[in-house]
Amino acid sequence: MTVQSINHLLFSVSDLEKSIAFYENVFGAKLLVKGNSTAYFDVNGLWLALNVEKDIPRNDIQYSYTHIAFTISEDEFDKMYDKLVQLKVLILDGRQRDERDKKSIYFTDPDGHKFEFHTGTLQDRLDYYKKEKLHMEFFNH
């Protein structure tokens, strides 16, 4: 028995209409279905779901580094940053990063879910860490 891939992502949201607009405008998500408290999208083949949950605390989530990262090309980095600014998306301060670790933009949706647009790959990260993070142990499978 093996895990095949990510099936879908679901985010709890407080305002369905505001969140639909966010995901359409920021991610280019294509709305597939909308109900009273749920919406499903296709994001370039990824199933994204939103469910309304109004009475849950949302004020401390920004202190966690937990996030979902999406790949963007290096050529599109500045354009994507400008788009987020134009859409008045909350852009977060990123961590200090070596250029070999590529570029990232961290931002949140209207409910504080944290995302990253990243120009690197897992292999870029591993290559960089192998050269610079000598305390790390690497495994071959």
Swiss-Prot record:
The keyword Protease does not apply. GO terms for cellular component: cytoplasm. InterPro entries: Fosfomycin_Res_Enzymes, Glyas_Bleomycin-R_OHBP_Dase, Glyas_Fos-R_dOase_dom, Metallothiol_Trafse_FosB, VOC. It is found in: Cytoplasm. Its EC number is 2.5.1.-. It comes from the Bacteria. Its main location: cytoplasm. GO terms for molecular function: magnesium ion binding; transferase activity, transferring alkyl or aryl (other than methyl) groups. The active site is at 116 (proton donor/acceptor). One of its GO terms (biological process) is response to antibiotic. PANTHER family: FOSFOMYCIN RESISTANCE PROTEIN FOSX, LYASE, PUTATIVE-RELATED-RELATED. Belongs to the fosfomycin resistance protein family. FosB subfamily. Metallothiol transferase which confers resistance to fosfomycin by catalyzing the addition of a thiol cofactor to fosfomycin. L-cysteine is probably the physiological thiol donor. This is Metallothiol transferase FosB. The gene is fosB.
